[in-house]
């Protein structure tokens, strides 16, 4: 049997939660779609907020770690040759942006042993899939770009899964589950992510429309978007390309009705402002292909420079820069900052005082003092060819402060996630490469 056909032949089932005893959410049947309610919903275990927009994101990783891998090695590293792989399931906020790493007490450092726990592998008929079987499917379909696949699973749950309000541990208790702790939420996050991924079979959809991996052929943006939209209830789907203008990612946007455990996802149009794919000449390279005209992707990019405040209050004649603790000064010398590409997207921000993060308990203040990278936040950064660019957080590029730091004073700054930006001083953060 050719491994490239493994995905097609298995026709793996979708594992619903419908028969799971004791955790069926006791929610009103007329609950509105996420992001569409006109009044407050009292029970946050039945209605997802603020992250009411769910993105099911998929990779097409074709670059192998080295040349001349055989089919077995390619599948192990990149997944089935006739399937996209899972990136994650992300709860974006209704008004834009997203939360991340929401509850450090719920974070995990292991998936393998958790899914081997006897509570998920005791022949309990209330579970539609055992933890061990689910782990097999994750290992086949959820691939990282660095070979450590479990580290991607851990990252995705810690960054996004901990922000899903309807699978908090207290929700399981409310629904009458027996002896359920936070492990059940981890199991459900991975199970539901896998289920939605299987429903959204990107490879088969493209193949049905004569868009198949090829070294020679190319496709238009309109062709690819139209094919995916047709199978997604006519809604627009986001596609992303790498620097070779080759298709490498697809995002499906959904609203949710009720709890995540209901799995009632409703397709919606992509909210992404733009794609990095060109209008024409998009490649869809087969897995294992290495373009000879380009170097391999730079997965460990670093940029060193300073951070200056840009366009303060829409052009007022004020100035400023960041010092090593993340505060704003208007006079003196700016600190050296380093932007470090994280393994799975976004960037770490660091000074010689430590890694930076946004502290939600302090009104989203920027603080740079953390010695352990596990405590570091992940920032948005889109460098230009020169290496300069704007810094954001959780999809938001608005920053603000309450006090202008005159002379040698310093002021804290804050990530502001509302369009109005209620801070007295409003600005962007521009990274300028040394």
UniProtKB/Swiss-Prot annotation:
First-tier enzyme category under EC: lyase
InterPro entries: Ribonuclease_T2_eukaryotic, RNase_T2-like, RNase_T2-like_sf, RNase_T2_His_AS_1, RNase_T2_His_AS_2
GO BP term, pick one: mRNA catabolic process
Record's comment on post-translational modification: N-glycosylated.
Intrachain disulfide bonds: 27-46, 35-94, 45-171, 102-163, 241-277
Documented EC number(s): 4.6.1.19
Keywords: Cytoplasm, Disulfide bond, Endonuclease, Glycoprotein, Hydrolase, Lyase, Nuclease, Signal, Vacuole
UniProt cross-references to PROSITE patterns, sorted A to Z: RNASE_T2_1, RNASE_T2_2
Localisation per UniProt entry: Vacuole lumen; Cytoplasm
Signal peptide per UniProt: 1-18
Record-level GO cellular component terms: cytosol; extracellular region; fungal-type vacuole; vacuolar lumen; vacuole
Glycosylation sites per record: 37, 70, 103, 123
Entry function: Rnase which modulates cell survival under stress conditions. Released from the vacuole to the cytoplasm during stress to promote tRNA and rRNA cleavage and to activate separately a downstream pathway that promotes cell death. Involved in cell size, vacuolar morphology and growth at high temperatures and high salt concentration.
Family per record: Belongs to the RNase T2 family.
Name of the protein: Ribonuclease T2-like
């Amino acid at each position: 049997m050719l491994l490239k056909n493994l995905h097609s032949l298995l026709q793996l089932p979708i594992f619903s939660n419908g028969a799971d005893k004791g955790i069926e959410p006791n929610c009103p049947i007329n609950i509105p779609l996420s992001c569409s309610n006109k009044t407050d919903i009292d029970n946050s275990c039945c209605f997802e907020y603020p992250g009411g927009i769910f993105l099911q994101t998929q990779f097409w990783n074709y670059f192998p770690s080295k040349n001349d891998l055989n089919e077995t090695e390619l599948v192990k590293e990149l997944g089935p040759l006739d399937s996209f792989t899972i990136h994650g399931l992300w709860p974006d906020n209704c008004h834009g942006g997203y939360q991340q790493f929401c509850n450090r007490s719920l974070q995990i450092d292991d998936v393998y042993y958790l899914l081997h726990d006897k509570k998920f592998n005791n022949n309990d008929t209330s579970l539609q899939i055992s933890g061990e079987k689910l782990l097999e499917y994750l290992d086949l379909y959820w691939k990282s770009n660095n070979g450590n696949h479990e580290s991607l699973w851990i990252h995705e749950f810690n960054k996004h899964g901990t922000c899903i309000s309807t699978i908090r541990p207290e929700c399981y208790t409310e629904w009458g589950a027996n002896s359920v702790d936070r492990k059940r939420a981890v199991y459900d996050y991975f199970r539901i992510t896998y289920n939605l991924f299987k429903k959204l079979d990107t490879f088969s959809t493209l193949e049905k429309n004569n868009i198949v991996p090829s070294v020679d052929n190319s496709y238009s943006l309109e062709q690819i978007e139209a094919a995916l939209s047709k199978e997604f209830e006519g809604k627009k789907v986001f596609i992303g390309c790498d620097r070779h203008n080759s298709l490498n990612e697809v995002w499906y946007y959904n609203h949710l009705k009720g709890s995540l455990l209901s799995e009632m996802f409703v397709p919606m149009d992509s909210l992404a402002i733009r794609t990095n794919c060109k209008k024409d000449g998009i490649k869809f390279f087969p897995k294992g292909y290495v373009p000879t005209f380009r170097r391999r992707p730079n997965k460990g990019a670093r940029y060193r420079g300073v951070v200056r405040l840009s366009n303060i209050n829409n052009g007022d004649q004020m100035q400023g820069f960041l010092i090593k603790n993340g505060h704003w000064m208007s006079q003196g010398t700016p600190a050296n900052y380093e932007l470090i590409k994280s393994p799975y997207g976004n960037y770490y921000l660091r000074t010689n005082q430590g890694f930076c993060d946004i502290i939600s308990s302090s009104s989203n203040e920027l603080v740079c003092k953390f010695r352990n990278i596990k405590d570091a936040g992940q920032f948005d950064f889109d460098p230009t060819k020169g290496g300069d660019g704007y810094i954001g957080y959780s999809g938001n590029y608005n920053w603000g402060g309450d006090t202008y730091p005159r002379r040698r004073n310093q002021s804290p700054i804050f990530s502001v996630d509302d369009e109005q930006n209620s801070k007295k001083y409003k600005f962007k953060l521009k990274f300028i490469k040394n």
